[in-house]
Regions:
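Catalytic-core regions of glycoside hydrolase
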Residues: 1-36, 40-260, 307-313, 317-321, ...
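Charged, low-complexity, helix-prone segments enriched in Lys/Glu/Asp/Gln
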Residues: 83, 245-247, 266, 278-285, ...
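Aromatic- and carboxylate-lined catalytic core of secreted/periplasmic carbohydrate-active enzymes
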Residues: 230-303, 317
Length: 365
C-alpha cells in the first residue's frame, strides 16, 4: 500500500510479475534500494529505542512460494542464502553507527536449511533457531525420534533432511555465527483449540532441551506462549499451564535443577500434605507426553486421544485418586489449589473422551 505503486521492483517477482499480494509474499532482497530503506528504518528504530539491544530482521512469515524469482535473487541461491546476503548487507550499513546492536533472523520454515556453501555472518547478526522438531521428545533423542524421516507435513517443509539439533549445528558451522538464540513453542492449543482444556506437561524434557540449547551456544530462549487469544490460552489458563510455563521460566533463570526438582519445590510450597501426590500427578502427565510417538512438531500437537490413550487416562485417574485421599488433611488455599487441579483434570478427561476419533466417533474408553 505504501510503496508498491511507485516501486514495484522492491517486491517479489513471482510467475513473471511483481506481486506483493501473493500468499507469503517477500521483498526483493537483492534490491539495493530495499536494503537502503531497511537500514534507514532500523537506524530510526534504534534512535527512538536507545535501550533496545536487538531488532528482528527476518523474511516475512510463510513458506517458500513468495520468494523473489528475479535474476539477481535467483543468483544468490536458496531462501537461506538470500537472507544471509540481505541481513549481512544491512548489518554492514548499520555497524558504524550501531556497533553493539544485533540483527536477528529466524532459521524457520523456508530458511530452515543451512547454506550449501560457507557464508560467514556479520558479527552483529544473531541466528534464532525455531524449534521445528518433535513436541514430545528432546532435541537430542536420536535422531529427534525420527520425525524428519517418518512424517510428511502439510506446512513448512514437506520433509526434513536433517533433524533440528544437527541442522542448527550445521548452520553455525557454515556461517561461523556465535550469536545464537532459540524460539520454542509452548502454545499447545494454537493449532487445535481442543488443547486449551487439556494438560501438556513436559517435565524433565524441558530442562533437558534447555541444556541442549545452552550447549548449542544459545544466549536466550524465547518461549512463544500465552496468555494470547490467538493461541487459545488466556489469563485463565495459568492453573492448567503453570507446570509447563513455570518450569520453562525457572530453568532459564537457574540451569542447575531438573524439572522434577523445580516442580517438587513448587508442590511443597503450594499443596501442603498433598505435595508428593501432586508431584506424582505432574510427573505422570510428563511421562505420558514422553511416551507419545504420534505426529507432533513445532506447535502442532497430536490428536488428544493419541497422547491420552485409555491406558494413559487410567494412570492419571489413579494419581488423581491418591490426591483425593489426602484432601481431608488440607484446608484453606492448599485445599482450594488441589481441588482446582483435580477439577481441571476431570474437565480435560471429558474433552478427551468426547473428542472425535479417526472414524468420526468419540474416542474409545
Amino acid at each position: 500500500e505504501q510503496y508498491f505503486q511507485e516501486h514495484p521492483e522492491w517486491y517479489c517477482l513471482v510467475d513473471g510479475r511483481r506481486n506483493p499480494y501473493v500468499e507469503w509474499w517477500q521483498m526483493c532482497y537483492s534490491n539495493e534500494e530495499v536494503q537502503r530503506l531497511t537500514a534507514e528504518k532500523l537506524d530510526r528504530y534504534f534512535r527512538e529505542h536507545p535501550y533496545c539491544t536487538q531488532a528482528a530482521l527476518s523474511a516475512n512469515d510463510g513458506y517458500f512460494e513468495g520468494f523473489c524469482e528475479c535474476e539477481d535473487c535467483r543468483r544468490l541461491g536458496t531462501p537461506s542464502e538470500v537472507m544471509i546476503y540481505f541481513v549481512n548487507r544491512i548489518a554492514e550499513r548499520l555497524e558504524k553507527e550501531w556497533p553493539d546492536k544485533q540483527l536477528m533472523f529466524f532459521v524457520y520454515f523456508p530458511t530452515y536449511d543451512p547454506p550449501r556453501r560457507k557464508m560467514p555472518l556479520h558479527k552483529n547478526v544473531m541466528l534464532m533457531f525455531c524449534k521445528e522438531s518433535c513436541m514430545c521428545h528432546s532435541v537430542d533423542s536420536g535422531p529427534d525420534c525420527g520425525y524428519h524421516v517418518r512424517y510428511r507435513y502439510e506446512f513448512g517443509h514437506n520433509h526434513y533432511d536433517l533433524p533440528w539439533l544437527e541442522n542448527a549445528r550445521r548452520w553455525i558451522e557454515m556461517t561461523d555465527c556465535r550469536n545464537i538464540s532459540v524460539w520454542d513453542w509452548y502454545c499447545p492449543a494454537a493449532a487445535n483449540p481442543v488443547w486449551k482444556d487439556i494438560p501438556w506437561v513436559q517435565g524433565d524434557l524441558a530442562t533437558r532441551n534447555q541444556r541442549c540449547f545452552r550447549e548449542l551456544g544459545a544466549q536466550y530462549v524465547y518461549y512463544d506462549q500465552g496468555p494470547a487469544e490467538a493461541f487459545n490460552d488466556t489469563e485463565s489458563s495459568y492453573p492448567l499451564r503453570w507446570p509447563l510455563w513455570y518450569v520453562g521460566a525457572y530453568g532459564m533463570w537457574d540451569n542447575r535443577p531438573t524439572a522434577t526438582q523445580i516442580l517438587s519445590d513448587a508442590c511443597q510450597k503450594l499443596f501442603g500434605a498433598a505435595a508428593d501426590a501432586m508431584l506424582s500427578y505432574y510427573l505422570c502427565l510428563a511421562d505420558i507426553n514422553g511416551r507419545c510417538n504420534a505426529k507432533a512438531i513445532a506447535w502442532h500437537m497430536p490428536e488428544p486421544q493419541e497422547m491420552y490413550t485409555p491406558e494413559a487416562v487410567a494412570l492419571v485417574d489413579r494419581a488423581a485418586a491418591a490426591i483425593r485421599s489426602l484432601c481431608g488433611e488440607l484446608s484453606g488455599n492448599e485445599l482450594r489449589r488441589v481441588e482446582n487441579q483435580l477439577a481441571l483434570w476431570e474437565k480435560a478427561k471429558a474433552v478427551i473422551q468426547n473428542y472425535p476419533s479417526g472414524d468420526g466417533g468419540p474416542a474409545a474408553h
